[in-house]
Amino acid sequence: MAAQKINEGLEHLAKAEKYLKTGFLKWKPDYDSAASEYGKAAVAFKNAKQFEQAKDACLKEAVAHENNRALFHAAKAYEQAGMMLKEMQKLPEAVQLIEKASMMYLENGTPDTAAMALERAGKLIENVDPEKAVQLYQQTANVFENEERLRQAVELLGKASRLLVRGRRFDEAAISIQKEKNIYKEIENYPTCYKKTIAQVLVHLHRNDYVAAERCVRESYSIPGFNGSEDCAALEQLLEGYDQQDQDQVAEVCNSPLFKYMDNDYAKLGLSLVVPGGGVKKKAAAPPQAKPEGTAAPAAEEEEDEYAGGLC
């Protein structure tokens, strides 16, 4: 079966080459027919699991379409070549071709297809190169935002934010989450704004920036329904505990269902949050115990006793 498909692919390649040849009576190559044959060859090689040959056929198809000024079809062929590279586990190269395809989709005036291609590329590379995936998701969000498809845009920004948090790139994560929050506010999804405020505060506290965290909460009072919500109350309690270096209070808030059932990356931020100094709030000192006669008191106690009766 595989051998048959390989032979079939080779036959289509040969036909494509003939369509590209010129002669005395044929002055111009037939790019359209050649592209069609290259496409058929790619399918045959793919079915035979000869992905290298399939990729090469896709690239030749793309060039033929470009020469024929058929940008959309050229982009499709480049995207298919990228998918063949994916099958070969050559993910960075695959993403490069899919990015090229997306730029051609944009040039052709099909931004939706461009955005879908970029998102697909992000998913491919996410586990191998999270930094590249963030870039791709942000590009996708920009495309959707330019098309005023804000719900799709904010979904992709959310993916980028979570990857930034996972990579502990907190400065960038704070900016990304703020963009999400702005869009959710614009589309009047206020409850999600509250959740994004929690995410912001956790990120800022991991940046050791209490002032920025407090400012996020203060600015959120203008969001309808936030003041008086359980999210607001929990954040005020969290900030109070953090400011007073009360690890117990911080842990209690971060272990509450409101925090634990957030997206996993943010829930982990809560569970790993440590107050400045890293300790539990100081407890009141125990009353001094009576010491038997002749027992030497510690130096610190001697210093205290020296002034026990007040200053003369």
Swiss-Prot record:
CDD domains: SNAP (cd15832)
Keywords of this entry: ER-Golgi transport, Golgi apparatus, Membrane, Protein transport, Transport
Gene3D superfamilies named among the record's database cross-references: Tetratricopeptide repeat domain
Disulfide-linked positions: none
Biased composition regions of type Low complexity, renumbered to the chain: 285-299
Chain spans, region Disordered: 281-312
Pfam families in the cross-refs: SNAP (PF14938)
Acidic residues bias: start-end ranges: 300-312
Endpoints of the signal sequence: none
Membrane disposition: Peripheral membrane protein
Classification via InterPro entries: NSF_attach, TPR-like_helical_dom_sf
Record-level Gene Ontology MF annotations: soluble NSF attachment protein activity; syntaxin binding
Subcellular location(s) of the protein: Membrane; Golgi apparatus
GO cellular component, one term: Golgi apparatus
GO biological process, one term: intracellular protein transport
PANTHER family documented for this protein: GAMMA-SOLUBLE NSF ATTACHMENT PROTEIN, SOLUBLE NSF ATTACHMENT PROTEIN SNAP
Physiological role: Required for vesicular transport between the endoplasmic reticulum and the Golgi apparatus.
Oligomer status and interactors: Interacts with RAB11FIP5. Interacts with VTI1A.
Similarity-based family: Belongs to the SNAP family.
Protein's name according to its UniProt entry: Gamma-soluble NSF attachment protein
Classification of source organism: Eukaryota, Metazoa, Chordata, Craniata, Vertebrata
Gene: NAPG
